[in-house]
Amino acid sequence: MTNQDKKAWLLQYRRLDERIDRLEKEKARWIERATKMSAPSDGMPHGSGVSDTVGLAVSKAADLAAEINREIDRLADLRREIEAAIQTVEGSVFREVLERKYIDGDTWENIAVQMHYSYMHVCRLHGMALTRMML
Protein backbone atom coordinates (compact mmCIF):
# COMPACT_ATOMS: atom_id res chain seq x y z
CA MET A 1 0.00 0.00 0.00
CA THR A 2 1.39 3.39 -0.98
CA ASN A 3 1.59 6.39 1.34
CA GLN A 4 -1.21 8.00 -0.72
CA ASP A 5 -3.40 4.95 -0.10
CA LYS A 6 -2.61 5.06 3.61
CA LYS A 7 -3.41 8.77 3.76
CA ALA A 8 -6.75 8.22 2.00
CA TRP A 9 -7.58 5.42 4.43
CA LEU A 10 -6.71 7.59 7.43
CA LEU A 11 -8.76 10.51 6.11
CA GLN A 12 -11.92 8.39 6.22
CA TYR A 13 -12.26 9.17 9.93
CA ARG A 14 -12.33 12.96 9.50
CA ARG A 15 -14.70 12.71 6.54
CA LEU A 16 -17.11 10.48 8.45
CA ASP A 17 -16.95 12.80 11.46
CA GLU A 18 -17.77 15.77 9.20
CA ARG A 19 -20.66 13.81 7.67
CA ILE A 20 -22.09 13.21 11.14
CA ASP A 21 -21.86 16.94 11.86
CA ARG A 22 -23.76 17.71 8.64
CA LEU A 23 -26.44 15.13 9.48
CA GLU A 24 -26.85 16.61 12.97
CA LYS A 25 -27.33 20.09 11.49
CA GLU A 26 -29.89 18.74 9.04
CA LYS A 27 -31.75 16.99 11.87
CA ALA A 28 -31.80 20.25 13.84
CA ARG A 29 -33.31 22.04 10.82
CA TRP A 30 -36.10 19.44 10.57
CA ILE A 31 -36.81 19.74 14.30
CA GLU A 32 -36.90 23.52 13.96
CA ARG A 33 -39.36 23.21 11.06
CA ALA A 34 -41.59 20.92 13.11
CA THR A 35 -41.66 23.29 16.07
CA LYS A 36 -42.35 26.36 13.90
CA MET A 37 -45.37 24.75 12.28
CA SER A 38 -48.64 24.95 14.15
CA ALA A 39 -52.27 24.35 13.40
CA PRO A 40 -54.51 27.37 12.76
CA SER A 41 -56.22 28.50 15.96
CA ASP A 42 -59.24 30.27 14.48
CA GLY A 43 -61.66 27.49 15.48
CA MET A 44 -62.62 26.71 11.90
CA PRO A 45 -62.11 23.25 10.41
CA HIS A 46 -59.09 22.99 8.13
CA GLY A 47 -57.45 20.28 6.13
CA SER A 48 -54.75 18.18 7.68
CA GLY A 49 -51.92 19.87 5.77
CA VAL A 50 -50.13 21.34 8.79
CA SER A 51 -50.40 18.14 10.78
CA ASP A 52 -49.06 16.12 7.84
CA THR A 53 -46.21 18.57 7.40
CA VAL A 54 -45.32 18.44 11.10
CA GLY A 55 -45.47 14.66 10.98
CA LEU A 56 -43.20 14.62 7.95
CA ALA A 57 -40.69 16.90 9.67
CA VAL A 58 -40.72 14.76 12.82
CA SER A 59 -40.34 11.61 10.73
CA LYS A 60 -37.37 13.09 8.83
CA ALA A 61 -35.73 14.08 12.13
CA ALA A 62 -36.23 10.57 13.52
CA ASP A 63 -34.80 8.98 10.36
CA LEU A 64 -31.78 11.25 10.58
CA ALA A 65 -31.30 10.41 14.27
CA ALA A 66 -31.20 6.70 13.39
CA GLU A 67 -28.74 7.36 10.56
CA ILE A 68 -26.56 9.47 12.87
CA ASN A 69 -26.46 6.64 15.41
CA ARG A 70 -25.39 4.15 12.72
CA GLU A 71 -22.68 6.53 11.50
CA ILE A 72 -21.44 7.11 15.06
CA ASP A 73 -21.08 3.34 15.46
CA ARG A 74 -19.10 3.22 12.21
CA LEU A 75 -16.98 6.16 13.39
CA ALA A 76 -16.12 4.40 16.66
CA ASP A 77 -15.16 1.21 14.80
CA LEU A 78 -13.06 3.17 12.31
CA ARG A 79 -11.33 5.08 15.10
CA ARG A 80 -10.31 1.80 16.77
CA GLU A 81 -8.92 0.53 13.45
CA ILE A 82 -7.00 3.75 12.83
CA GLU A 83 -5.63 3.87 16.37
CA ALA A 84 -4.46 0.26 16.00
CA ALA A 85 -2.76 1.11 12.70
CA ILE A 86 -1.07 4.16 14.23
CA GLN A 87 0.20 2.00 17.08
CA THR A 88 2.14 -0.10 14.53
CA VAL A 89 4.41 2.92 13.98
CA GLU A 90 7.55 2.86 16.09
CA GLY A 91 8.32 6.21 17.64
CA SER A 92 6.01 8.36 19.71
CA VAL A 93 6.73 11.50 17.65
CA PHE A 94 5.55 9.78 14.47
CA ARG A 95 2.43 8.47 16.22
CA GLU A 96 1.68 11.93 17.62
CA VAL A 97 1.84 13.52 14.16
CA LEU A 98 -0.57 10.91 12.79
CA GLU A 99 -2.96 11.19 15.74
CA ARG A 100 -3.04 14.98 15.64
CA LYS A 101 -3.66 15.02 11.90
CA TYR A 102 -6.04 12.14 11.33
CA ILE A 103 -7.87 11.79 14.64
CA ASP A 104 -7.82 15.33 16.04
CA GLY A 105 -8.06 16.97 12.61
CA ASP A 106 -5.33 19.53 13.33
CA THR A 107 -3.73 21.52 10.52
CA TRP A 108 -0.06 21.02 9.70
CA GLU A 109 0.64 24.52 10.97
CA ASN A 110 -1.03 23.85 14.32
CA ILE A 111 0.76 20.51 14.68
CA ALA A 112 4.09 22.25 14.05
CA VAL A 113 3.37 24.91 16.67
CA GLN A 114 2.15 22.41 19.27
CA MET A 115 5.10 20.07 18.74
CA HIS A 116 7.65 22.93 18.48
CA TYR A 117 8.81 21.89 15.01
CA SER A 118 8.91 23.70 11.70
CA TYR A 119 6.13 23.13 9.21
CA MET A 120 8.55 21.37 6.84
CA HIS A 121 9.84 19.08 9.58
CA VAL A 122 6.30 18.03 10.49
CA CYS A 123 5.67 17.24 6.81
CA ARG A 124 8.82 15.10 6.74
CA LEU A 125 7.79 13.32 9.95
CA HIS A 126 4.38 12.67 8.43
CA GLY A 127 5.90 11.04 5.35
CA MET A 128 8.17 8.87 7.47
CA ALA A 129 5.28 7.92 9.76
CA LEU A 130 3.14 6.84 6.82
CA THR A 131 6.00 4.73 5.47
CA ARG A 132 6.39 3.02 8.86
CA MET A 133 2.66 2.38 9.36
CA MET A 134 1.49 -1.17 8.74
CA LEU A 135 -1.99 -1.75 7.35
Residue ranges and their predicted role:
Residues 1-88, 135:
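N-terminal interaction/assembly modules
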Residues 90-104:
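Short amphipathic alpha helix immediately N-terminal
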Residues 86-93, 121:
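Short coil/turn residues that cap or connect secondary-structure elements
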